[in-house]
């Protein structure tokens, strides 16, 4: 006997648009508030943006990262990140860890503080050898922030433009514009969350934002594809009703995908360690806001813009809409 887990019934009839554009306008207001928070409060930049000191530690003993971290907790340090370094060329008894330290108040890490760090690590691992120490001062870190932030903004902007072009070609320009509006609110609100709560913002969070964009567009394309299928077979029903049908038909898939993603992210947040916790936190919030924006932002924008109903209508140059054909060899 087979058992099937159903979080959502096969057939649902939820009217997602009974509140009109209120949820959409509320989302726009929240995105604007997030932008204002980033501009006024700012972000709690991590070592990737502010610079600091990187210490490379090698040992013949495989000491856990948690033991290194416990040893450094006794010292008054700024933001500290400890990661294991793996390389196929390492010997069987060669274990390398990288300790990255951001000094408090954005000042340069002193040699005395570096000495305290090395002494603390030698207590828990007498075999440890420090093979390299690199420091990025506060003057360089200011330039680093500008360059890194600009690169991150350009990366997100390029991904949004590419996604809009794809959806435009795959469907219609209204779908592409609606998708990009939803993706922008996803990214902006997520970044705003980090600004308001001053959670550490580093390159892993930039990666999380781009991952959220990918997760979100996947959900939107599924819904838009169902809308197009329904439009092809129904040319009389009002578009809002067809959109509700499409959202309900894909609701089970959306819920199951989101729930399984959240379960994995919760495990990463709890047991993944400090390095990946920020990524998991951003993804937990982003996976929920992505589904929300599909229904209450992207779909609503498409309704406001309207779409043509004659998907199968022939024109002088061929079928209407963007079509891709292949010929047999």
UniProtKB/Swiss-Prot annotation:
Localisation: Cell inner membrane
Transmembrane portions of the chain: 27-47, 149-169, 177-197, 204-224, 256-276, 279-299
GO biological process, one term: intracellular protein transmembrane transport
Keywords on record: Cell inner membrane, Cell membrane, Membrane, Protein transport, Translocation, Transmembrane, Transmembrane helix, Transport
Cell inner membrane recorded as keyword: yes
Annotated membrane topology: Multi-pass membrane protein
Cystine pairings recorded for this chain: none
Entries under InterPro entries matching the protein: SecD/SecF_arch_bac, SecD/SecF_bac, SecD/SecF_CS, SecD_SecF_C, SecD_SecF_C_bact, SecF_bac
UniProt main location, coarse: membrane
One matching Pfam family: Sec_GG
GO annotation, cellular component aspect: plasma membrane
GO MF annotations, alphabetized: protein-transporting ATPase activity
Keyword Iron-sulfur: no
Subunit structure: Forms a complex with SecD. Part of the essential Sec protein translocation apparatus which comprises SecA, SecYEG and auxiliary proteins SecDF-YajC and YidC.
HAMAP family assigned: SecF_B
Task of the protein: Part of the Sec protein translocase complex. Interacts with the SecYEG preprotein conducting channel. SecDF uses the proton motive force (PMF) to complete protein translocation after the ATP-dependent function of SecA.
Similarity comment text for this entry: Belongs to the SecD/SecF family. SecF subfamily.
Protein name stated in the entry: Protein translocase subunit SecF
Record organism: Ketogulonicigenium vulgare (strain Y25)
Lineage, top ranks: Bacteria, Pseudomonadati, Pseudomonadota, Alphaproteobacteria, Rhodobacterales
């Amino acid at each position: 006997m087979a058992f099937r887990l159903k979080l959502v019934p096969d057939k649902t009839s939820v009217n997602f648009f009974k509140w009109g554009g209120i949820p959409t306008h509320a989302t726009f207001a929240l995105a604007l508030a997030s932008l204002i928070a980033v501009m006024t409060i700012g972000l709690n930049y991590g070592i990737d943006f502010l610079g600091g000191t990187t210490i490379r530690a090698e040992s013949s003993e495989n000491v856990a990262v948690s033991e290194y971290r416990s040893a450094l907790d006794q010292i008054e340090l700024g933001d500290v990140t400890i990661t294991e370094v793996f390389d196929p060329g390492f010997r069987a008894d060669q274990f390398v860890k990288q300790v990255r330290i951001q000094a408090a108040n954005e000042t340069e890490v002193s040699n005395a503080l570096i000495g305290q760090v090395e002494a603390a690590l030698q207590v828990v691992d007498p075999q440890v050898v420090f093979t390299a120490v690199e420091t990025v001062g506060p003057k360089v870190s200011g330039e680093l922030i500008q360059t890194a932030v600009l690169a991150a903004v350009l990366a997100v902007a390029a991904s949004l433009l590419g996604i809009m072009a794809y959806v435009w070609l795959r469907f219609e320009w209204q779908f592409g514009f609606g998708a990009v509006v939803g993706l922008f609110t996803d990214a902006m609100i997520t970044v705003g969350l980090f600004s308001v709560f001053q959670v550490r913002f580093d390159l892993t969070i930039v990666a999380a934002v781009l991952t959220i964009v990918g997760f979100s567009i996947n959900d939107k394309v599924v819904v838009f594809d169902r809308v197009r299928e329904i439009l092809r077979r129904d040319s009389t029903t009002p578009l809002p009703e067809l959109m509700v049908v499409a959202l309900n038909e894909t609701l089970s898939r959306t819920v199951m995908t989101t729930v399984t993603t959240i379960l994995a992210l919760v495990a990463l947040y709890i047991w993944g360690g400090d390095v990946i916790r920020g990524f998991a936190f951003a993804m937990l919030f982003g996976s929920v806001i992505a589904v929300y924006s599909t229904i209450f932002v992207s779909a609503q924008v498409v309704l406001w813009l309207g779409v043509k109903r004659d998907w199968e209508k022939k024109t002088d140059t061929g079928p209407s809409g963007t079509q891709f054909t292949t010929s047999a060899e």
